[in-house]
Regions:
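Extended, highly charged accessory segments
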Residues: 1-89, 94, 100-104, 111-118, ...
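Glycine-rich phosphate/ribose-binding loops and adjacent secondary-structure elements
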Residues: 85-94, 99, 103-214
Length: 214
């Protein structure tokens, strides 16, 4: 066991493997599984209507920069997007800047908690303003701004919206440089993200391709 702080995802790893039949594989088992994602307001699930079907279809929950830009500037009836920062003052708790910043609750609890509360308030205000696509972004991370752990931001907002009765009115999109492993994406999707733009992972792949490494 490591005595070093870990990314939040690592604390969710299980000590066993569960085999599924059929495999959860939308490529080889496309008849029974799919990776399609839908963005938009679901409305009242107990009273379905035509408006509940007004959604944008994505073939994969992982999207690139162009798709994210299109979603941010969507100009269709029934759709309105906004970007919400998931950052907090590093002086209030980030032990180091960047996407591997470790948050020590003994030091950063108040700063991190305040940032989460602000995120929830911003989301509630956006929903009241008619927004139905919330884009959580850590794009402006820097020396003075540390990112809220993406899994914490997504899961926290998801459960907050459930408690407010507004979760089915919005979709949660994550724009983050933090996730890069299969487990990261699985956890984020499982805890409430509808789409993920892993911009740093995508830029890393592009850089490796340009150098001829892959």
């Amino acid at each position: 066991l490591s005595d070093q702080p870990q990314l939040l995802y690592n604390y969710f790893k299980q000590l066993f493997a569960q085999v599924t039949n059929p495999p959860i594989d939308p490529i080889r088992e496309e008849l029974v599984t799919a990776s399609i994602s839908f963005i938009g307001s679901e409305g009242d699930l107990t009273r379905p209507s035509a408006d509940s079907c007004r959604m944008i279809k994505f073939e994969s929950p992982l999207i690139d920069h162009k798709q994210l830009a299109q979603l941010r500037h969507v100009d269709l009836p029934g759709f309105k997007a906004t970007r919400l920062p998931i950052l907090f003052e590093s002086a209030a708790g980030g032990l180091e800047s960047g996407h591997n910043a470790i948050v020590d609750p003994r030091i950063s609890g108040k700063g991190l908690e305040a940032a989460l509360e602000q995120l929830f308030e911003n989301a509630d205000a956006a929903i009241r303003d008619g927004v139905n696509v919330l884009i959580l972004s850590d794009r402006k991370v820097g020396a003075k701004k540390a990112p809220i752990p993406a899994l914490l931001a997504v899961a926290g907002l998801h459960h907050h919206l459930v408690s407010q009765g507004t979760r089915t009115r919005v979709s949660i999109v994550l724009e983050s440089g933090e996730p890069r492993e299969v487990q990261h994406f699985a956890l984020l999707l499982g805890y409430g993200a509808n789409l993920i733009n892993p911009y740093l992972a995508l830029e890393t792949v592009r850089h490796l391709v340009s150098r001829g490494d892959i």
